[in-house]
Amino acid sequence: MASGKKLIDQLCSVVSSFLCPSISSLDIDRCAVGPHIFSRGSSQAICTVKLLHGEVYNLEFVYRYWAHILEKYNFPFSPTFIICNNGLAVTLKCYVSEPRDLSSRYGQATSMALDVNLQRNSFVVLSQDDFIKFKTPLVFAKDLDITNSMVVCRTYLTSSRNSLQFLVVKSKNPRRLENVLDMIKRAVEATGSNLPATREKPLPLEQTEQLESTLPSSGHLRVLQSTSLTGRCPSWGAACALLLLSLAVGLMAILAAKLMQWP
Protein backbone atom coordinates (compact mmCIF):
# COMPACT_ATOMS: atom_id res chain seq x y z
CA MET A 1 0.00 0.00 0.00
CA ALA A 2 2.93 2.31 0.70
CA SER A 3 4.17 1.96 -2.87
CA GLY A 4 0.61 2.58 -4.09
CA LYS A 5 0.40 5.83 -2.13
CA LYS A 6 3.78 6.88 -3.45
CA LEU A 7 2.65 6.23 -7.02
CA ILE A 8 -0.55 8.26 -6.55
CA ASP A 9 1.49 11.12 -5.08
CA GLN A 10 3.82 11.07 -8.08
CA LEU A 11 1.02 11.00 -10.65
CA CYS A 12 -0.95 13.79 -8.99
CA SER A 13 2.21 15.86 -8.64
CA VAL A 14 2.78 15.63 -12.41
CA VAL A 15 -0.77 16.84 -13.04
CA SER A 16 -0.47 19.73 -10.58
CA SER A 17 2.91 20.84 -11.92
CA PHE A 18 2.56 20.47 -15.68
CA LEU A 19 -1.07 20.25 -16.81
CA CYS A 20 -1.60 24.02 -16.88
CA PRO A 21 1.32 26.11 -15.58
CA SER A 22 -0.67 29.34 -15.98
CA ILE A 23 -2.98 28.24 -13.14
CA SER A 24 -1.28 28.62 -9.78
CA SER A 25 -3.55 26.10 -8.06
CA LEU A 26 -5.54 23.51 -10.00
CA ASP A 27 -8.95 22.42 -8.76
CA ILE A 28 -7.91 18.78 -8.40
CA ASP A 29 -9.67 16.00 -6.52
CA ARG A 30 -7.50 13.01 -5.61
CA CYS A 31 -8.79 9.50 -5.09
CA ALA A 32 -8.53 7.57 -1.86
CA VAL A 33 -5.67 5.07 -1.69
CA GLY A 34 -6.68 1.46 -2.22
CA PRO A 35 -5.59 -1.58 -4.26
CA HIS A 36 -8.79 -1.50 -6.33
CA ILE A 37 -7.75 1.70 -8.12
CA PHE A 38 -4.90 -0.17 -9.85
CA SER A 39 -7.14 -2.98 -11.08
CA ARG A 40 -7.83 -3.35 -14.77
CA GLY A 41 -10.98 -1.47 -15.75
CA SER A 42 -11.28 0.28 -12.38
CA SER A 43 -13.99 2.95 -12.30
CA GLN A 44 -11.98 5.07 -9.84
CA ALA A 45 -9.99 7.91 -11.39
CA ILE A 46 -6.62 8.67 -9.80
CA CYS A 47 -7.53 12.34 -9.94
CA THR A 48 -10.19 14.64 -11.39
CA VAL A 49 -9.40 18.17 -12.55
CA LYS A 50 -12.03 20.83 -13.17
CA LEU A 51 -11.20 22.60 -16.44
CA LEU A 52 -11.53 26.37 -16.71
CA HIS A 53 -12.44 28.68 -19.58
CA GLY A 54 -9.70 30.11 -21.78
CA GLU A 55 -6.84 27.90 -20.60
CA VAL A 56 -4.41 25.67 -22.49
CA TYR A 57 -3.83 22.22 -21.00
CA ASN A 58 -0.75 20.15 -21.80
CA LEU A 59 -2.58 16.86 -22.16
CA GLU A 60 -0.12 14.77 -24.13
CA PHE A 61 2.87 15.81 -22.06
CA VAL A 62 1.15 14.83 -18.80
CA TYR A 63 -0.10 11.61 -20.40
CA ARG A 64 3.39 10.63 -21.58
CA TYR A 65 4.83 11.47 -18.17
CA TRP A 66 2.24 9.20 -16.55
CA ALA A 67 3.04 6.38 -18.98
CA HIS A 68 6.74 6.72 -18.17
CA ILE A 69 6.12 6.56 -14.41
CA LEU A 70 3.81 3.54 -14.72
CA GLU A 71 6.37 1.76 -16.89
CA LYS A 72 8.99 2.23 -14.15
CA TYR A 73 6.60 0.45 -11.77
CA ASN A 74 6.16 -2.40 -14.30
CA PHE A 75 2.48 -1.54 -14.52
CA PRO A 76 0.93 -3.64 -17.33
CA PHE A 77 -1.65 -1.12 -18.60
CA SER A 78 -1.56 2.27 -20.31
CA PRO A 79 -3.20 5.34 -18.76
CA THR A 80 -6.46 6.72 -20.09
CA PHE A 81 -7.58 10.33 -19.80
CA ILE A 82 -11.23 11.31 -20.21
CA ILE A 83 -12.66 14.80 -20.66
CA CYS A 84 -16.36 14.78 -19.83
CA ASN A 85 -19.24 17.21 -19.47
CA ASN A 86 -21.84 16.22 -16.89
CA GLY A 87 -23.87 19.40 -17.31
CA LEU A 88 -22.40 21.05 -14.23
CA ALA A 89 -18.71 21.14 -15.13
CA VAL A 90 -16.19 19.96 -17.69
CA THR A 91 -13.57 17.80 -16.02
CA LEU A 92 -10.48 15.80 -16.89
CA LYS A 93 -10.45 12.36 -15.29
CA CYS A 94 -7.13 10.51 -15.22
CA TYR A 95 -7.09 6.71 -14.97
CA VAL A 96 -4.20 4.26 -14.92
CA SER A 97 -6.16 1.97 -17.28
CA GLU A 98 -9.27 2.34 -19.41
CA PRO A 99 -12.38 2.06 -17.20
CA ARG A 100 -15.28 -0.20 -18.10
CA ASP A 101 -18.70 0.93 -19.32
CA LEU A 102 -17.68 4.42 -20.39
CA SER A 103 -20.95 5.10 -22.20
CA SER A 104 -23.08 4.20 -19.19
CA ARG A 105 -20.96 6.43 -16.96
CA TYR A 106 -20.30 9.45 -19.16
CA GLY A 107 -22.79 9.35 -22.03
CA GLN A 108 -22.02 9.86 -25.72
CA ALA A 109 -18.46 9.33 -26.94
CA THR A 110 -16.91 12.09 -29.07
CA SER A 111 -13.69 11.72 -31.05
CA MET A 112 -10.71 14.03 -30.63
CA ALA A 113 -10.77 16.67 -33.38
CA LEU A 114 -9.52 20.17 -34.09
CA ASP A 115 -12.77 21.56 -32.68
CA VAL A 116 -15.05 19.58 -30.37
CA ASN A 117 -18.44 20.75 -29.18
CA LEU A 118 -18.66 18.89 -25.90
CA GLN A 119 -22.37 18.65 -25.26
CA ARG A 120 -23.91 17.69 -21.97
CA ASN A 121 -23.39 14.02 -21.06
CA SER A 122 -20.65 13.49 -23.63
CA PHE A 123 -16.95 12.69 -23.33
CA VAL A 124 -13.65 12.44 -25.20
CA VAL A 125 -11.27 9.53 -24.59
CA LEU A 126 -7.54 10.26 -24.75
CA SER A 127 -5.13 7.35 -25.09
CA GLN A 128 -1.71 6.90 -26.66
CA ASP A 129 -3.22 5.83 -29.99
CA ASP A 130 -5.58 8.83 -29.98
CA PHE A 131 -2.70 11.28 -29.68
CA ILE A 132 -0.80 9.60 -32.52
CA LYS A 133 -3.88 9.48 -34.78
CA PHE A 134 -4.57 13.15 -34.17
CA LYS A 135 -1.02 14.27 -34.92
CA THR A 136 -0.40 12.05 -37.95
CA PRO A 137 -2.12 14.31 -40.55
CA LEU A 138 -0.58 17.45 -39.05
CA VAL A 139 3.12 16.63 -38.70
CA PHE A 140 5.77 14.58 -40.46
CA ALA A 141 6.29 11.04 -39.20
CA LYS A 142 9.67 12.00 -37.75
CA ASP A 143 7.97 14.64 -35.58
CA LEU A 144 5.39 12.38 -33.92
CA ASP A 145 7.58 11.85 -30.87
CA ILE A 146 6.82 13.95 -27.79
CA THR A 147 10.25 15.61 -28.02
CA ASN A 148 9.24 17.13 -31.36
CA SER A 149 5.50 17.81 -31.02
CA MET A 150 2.69 17.47 -28.53
CA VAL A 151 -1.07 17.87 -28.30
CA VAL A 152 -2.57 20.58 -26.13
CA CYS A 153 -6.19 21.51 -25.50
CA ARG A 154 -7.58 25.04 -25.40
CA THR A 155 -10.92 25.39 -23.58
CA TYR A 156 -13.93 27.56 -24.40
CA LEU A 157 -16.33 26.96 -21.54
CA THR A 158 -19.31 29.29 -21.21
CA SER A 159 -22.88 29.08 -20.00
CA SER A 160 -24.10 28.58 -23.56
CA ARG A 161 -21.44 26.32 -25.04
CA ASN A 162 -18.57 24.06 -24.00
CA SER A 163 -15.95 23.66 -26.72
CA LEU A 164 -12.50 22.14 -26.86
CA GLN A 165 -9.85 23.02 -29.43
CA PHE A 166 -7.11 20.42 -29.80
CA LEU A 167 -3.86 21.81 -31.20
CA VAL A 168 -0.43 20.44 -32.03
CA VAL A 169 2.52 22.52 -30.86
CA LYS A 170 6.12 22.02 -31.88
CA SER A 171 9.38 22.99 -30.25
CA LYS A 172 11.61 25.37 -32.17
CA ASN A 173 14.67 23.60 -30.83
CA PRO A 174 14.16 19.82 -30.42
CA ARG A 175 17.89 19.20 -29.95
CA ARG A 176 18.06 21.54 -26.97
CA LEU A 177 14.94 19.93 -25.53
CA GLU A 178 16.46 16.45 -25.82
CA ASN A 179 19.63 17.63 -24.07
CA VAL A 180 17.63 19.07 -21.16
CA LEU A 181 15.59 15.87 -20.87
CA ASP A 182 18.78 13.80 -20.79
CA MET A 183 20.20 16.05 -18.07
CA ILE A 184 17.10 15.64 -15.90
CA LYS A 185 17.06 11.90 -16.52
CA ARG A 186 20.70 11.51 -15.44
CA ALA A 187 20.11 13.59 -12.31
CA VAL A 188 17.05 11.56 -11.30
CA GLU A 189 18.80 8.24 -12.01
CA ALA A 190 21.82 9.32 -9.95
CA THR A 191 19.52 10.25 -7.08
CA GLY A 192 17.82 6.87 -7.19
CA SER A 193 21.13 5.00 -7.16
CA ASN A 194 22.33 6.89 -4.07
CA LEU A 195 19.11 6.50 -2.11
CA PRO A 196 18.29 2.76 -2.02
CA ALA A 197 15.61 3.31 0.60
CA THR A 198 13.55 5.36 -1.83
CA ARG A 199 13.99 3.08 -4.83
CA GLU A 200 10.69 2.36 -6.50
CA LYS A 201 9.25 -1.13 -6.28
CA PRO A 202 6.83 -2.76 -8.72
CA LEU A 203 3.25 -2.51 -7.62
CA PRO A 204 1.59 -5.72 -6.42
CA LEU A 205 -0.76 -6.74 -9.23
CA GLU A 206 -2.67 -9.52 -7.50
CA GLN A 207 -5.82 -7.40 -7.65
CA THR A 208 -5.35 -6.93 -11.36
CA GLU A 209 -4.99 -10.64 -11.97
CA GLN A 210 -8.01 -11.47 -9.88
CA LEU A 211 -10.28 -9.04 -11.70
CA GLU A 212 -8.74 -9.88 -15.09
CA SER A 213 -10.94 -7.83 -14.78
CA THR A 214 9.09 14.14 -20.76
CA LEU A 215 8.47 17.62 -21.84
CA PRO A 216 7.66 21.10 -21.71
CA SER A 217 9.87 22.73 -24.29
CA SER A 218 12.74 24.88 -23.12
CA GLY A 219 12.16 27.06 -26.16
CA HIS A 220 9.04 28.81 -27.34
CA LEU A 221 6.18 26.81 -28.80
CA ARG A 222 4.37 27.45 -32.02
CA VAL A 223 1.11 26.12 -33.39
CA LEU A 224 1.43 24.00 -36.50
CA GLN A 225 -0.72 25.33 -39.32
CA SER A 226 -3.05 23.20 -41.45
CA THR A 227 -5.86 23.95 -43.85
CA SER A 228 -8.41 23.82 -41.07
CA LEU A 229 -6.21 24.95 -38.16
CA THR A 230 -5.76 28.67 -37.80
CA GLY A 231 -5.58 28.92 -34.00
CA ARG A 232 -2.63 28.43 -32.75
CA CYS A 233 22.61 15.71 7.81
CA PRO A 234 23.14 12.36 6.39
CA SER A 235 26.26 10.97 4.73
CA TRP A 236 28.06 12.77 1.89
CA GLY A 237 26.51 10.40 -0.67
CA ALA A 238 23.00 11.11 0.57
CA ALA A 239 23.67 14.86 0.60
CA CYS A 240 24.82 14.72 -3.02
CA ALA A 241 21.74 12.73 -3.93
CA LEU A 242 19.45 15.30 -2.33
CA LEU A 243 21.29 18.07 -4.17
CA LEU A 244 20.79 16.29 -7.50
CA LEU A 245 17.12 15.77 -6.73
CA SER A 246 16.71 19.47 -5.98
CA LEU A 247 18.42 20.30 -9.26
CA ALA A 248 16.09 18.02 -11.20
CA VAL A 249 12.99 19.47 -9.56
CA GLY A 250 14.23 23.01 -10.17
CA LEU A 251 14.87 22.29 -13.84
CA MET A 252 11.41 20.84 -14.32
CA ALA A 253 9.82 23.83 -12.59
CA ILE A 254 11.68 26.26 -14.85
CA LEU A 255 10.70 24.31 -17.95
CA ALA A 256 7.07 24.18 -16.85
CA ALA A 257 7.04 27.95 -16.37
CA LYS A 258 8.32 28.45 -19.90
CA LEU A 259 5.96 25.97 -21.51
CA MET A 260 3.22 28.46 -22.18
CA GLN A 261 5.45 31.10 -23.77
CA TRP A 262 4.50 31.64 -27.39
CA PRO A 263 6.51 33.43 -30.13
Curated annotation (Swiss-Prot):
InterPro entries: Herpesvirus_viron_egress-type
Keyword set, alphabetical order: Host membrane, Host nucleus, Late protein, Membrane, Phosphoprotein, Transmembrane, Transmembrane helix
Membrane-crossing residue ranges in chain numbering: 236-256
Keyword ATP-binding annotated: no
Localisation per UniProt entry: Host nucleus inner membrane
Subunit structure: Forms a heterohexameric complex with NEC1.
Protein name, UniProt field: Nuclear egress protein 2
Taxonomic source organism: Alcelaphine herpesvirus 1 (strain C500) (AlHV-1)
